[in-house]
């Protein structure tokens, strides 16, 4: 996300996830100990990986009501700006990074577009993923004409799996606010 130029990070967490907040907090005890022991190189490594003050925000999802609900919980922090969603359980390793490519694509479109990163999966595994139905193709981009979360075997509209990287416009919050619950009683983003 840093490679893509993201400057503010918002984490939506649930109950018993305070360790995530602690991870991104400044570890002044460790810094003090390293200084006392003359470990300047280690202090520099800590400083390089430490987010700037105010660059990280946390909000709580009070109940596990799905990804759409988690995104909606961040609405007051996001405000009226386009934003990225990065799911931590999906590791996407590309050079340049997936999110950087998506932000560059969004900028090149020059319009308010929502982007979703996808990856082809074997047809026999589509029932395990959120899958996009696609329409018109333009290079590496497809127009999405539908999405289905974990379709029944043999019913997927394509083999393009949603990989947990999104560029979204703030208008999505109004849609999520009135979204009906879907699979598993959750408010889905897909």
Region annotations inferred by a language model:
Residues 5-7, 79, 143:
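Short loop/turn motifs at secondary-structure junctions
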Residues 30-32, 42, 46-134, 177:
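Conserved beta-loop-beta/alpha segment of the NTase-like Rossmann-fold superfamily
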Residues 15, 86, 94, 167-168:
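A conserved hydrophobic position in a structured secondary element of the catalytic/binding core
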Residues 16-19, 70, 98, 102, ...:
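General structural feature for long, well-ordered alpha-helical segments within catalytic domains
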Residues 84, 107, 137-190:
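Catalytic-core segments of class I nucleotidyltransferases/pyrophosphorylases
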Residues 1-41, 61, 97-104:
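N-terminal glycine-rich phosphate-binding loop and ensuing alpha1 helix
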């Amino acid at each position: 996300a840093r490679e893509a130029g993201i400057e503010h990070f918002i984490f939506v967490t649930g109950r018993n996830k305070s360790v995530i907040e602690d991870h991104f907090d400044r570890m002044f005890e460790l810094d003090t100990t390293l200084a006392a022991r003359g470990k300047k190189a280690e202090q520099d490594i800590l400083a390089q990986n430490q987010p700037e003050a105010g660059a990280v925000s946390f909000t709580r999802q009070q109940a596990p009501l799905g990804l759409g609900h988690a995104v909606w919980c961040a609405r007051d922090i996001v405000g009226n700006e386009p934003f990225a969603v990065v799911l931590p359980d999906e590791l996407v390793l590309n050079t340049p990074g997936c999110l950087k490519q998506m932000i560059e694509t969004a900028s090149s479109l020059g319009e308010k577009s929502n982007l979703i990163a996808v990856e082809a999966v074997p047809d026999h595994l589509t029932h395990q993923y959120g899958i996009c139905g696609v329409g018109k193709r333009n290079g590496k981009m497809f127009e999405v004409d539908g999405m289905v979360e974990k379709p029944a075997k043999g019913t997927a509209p394509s083999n393009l799996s949603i990989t947990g990287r999104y560029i979204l416009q703030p208008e999505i919050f109004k849609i999520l606010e009135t979204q009906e619950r879907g699979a598993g009683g959750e408010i889905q983003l897909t």
